[in-house]
Amino acid sequence: IAQCLVGSEMCIRDRFTVNAQGVCAGFPELTYLTSDAAGHVAIADYLHSLYGRYGIALTVTAQDMDTFLASRAAGGYSVTRCSFSADIDDPMPFLSLWASGAGSNCVALGRGAHADYAGYSVTLDGRTKDNCTWAESYDALLYRIQSSGDTAERYSLMHQAETLLMQTGAVCPLYWYTDTYLCNTHVQGLLSGPLGAQYLMGAHVEK
């Protein structure tokens, strides 16, 4: 996250411009770090092409899995991929990834240079507190969620935690790659459950 803050300061300082076609000029070059599995490299190549349309140079670095994990843990990237598969039908396994002390927190939210950053707000028990650190906001929300038995309260707090996470700009969900399938646009009503089951009872063809 410290690198993200430095990158943001660079963008503000250099004042990159965007023309009428949405193409950037002067945007800092980015490196996308990924493992060398074919599917992940294909996504990286697509992102390289997509960013290029907007004038942003994105260099793809593909490494074998062991090297990739070590590079990611060391923060050797500007953008990297991260994946996770939950074992229960609940948002918490995913939200818990980004707790300050989580080993899966590869962007180091709430750690290092980011630990003392007090730029977040949190609302608990109807009271909003501003100028909170990641531990005082996100971690506090997770603790309350884990200790609550009230479904409505849990989901309200989980939405708040999700909003905090998205506001950092450190995480950008792409797709659910453990449950990929092709579906003709004429097929309607197909439901895919969060644990991978496909429900066909409401499926029908429209032409």
Task: Please tell me what each predicted stretch does.
Residues 8, 15-26, 71-75, 96-143, ...:
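Short, solvent-exposed loop/beta-turn-alpha elements that line the ligand-binding surface or hinge
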Residues 48-56, 73-77, 85, 99-103, ...:
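Sec-exported extracytoplasmic/periplasmic mature domains
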Residues 93, 116, 164-166:
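A short hydrophobic/aromatic micro-motif that marks alpha-helical segments and, especially, helix-coil
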Residues 88-91, 183:
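Short catalytic/ligand-binding loop motif for oxyanion handling, primarily in non-cytosolic enzymes
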Residues 1-7, 11-12:
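Single conserved hydrophobic/aromatic residue that forms the stacking wall/gate
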Residues 13-87, 151, 178-179:
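Ligand/substrate-recognition segments at binding pockets and active sites
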Residues 31-37, 41, 144, 148-150, ...:
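Extended amphipathic secondary-structure runs
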Residues 8-9, 39-43, 47-50, 64, ...:
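Stable alpha-helical elements in mature extracytoplasmic
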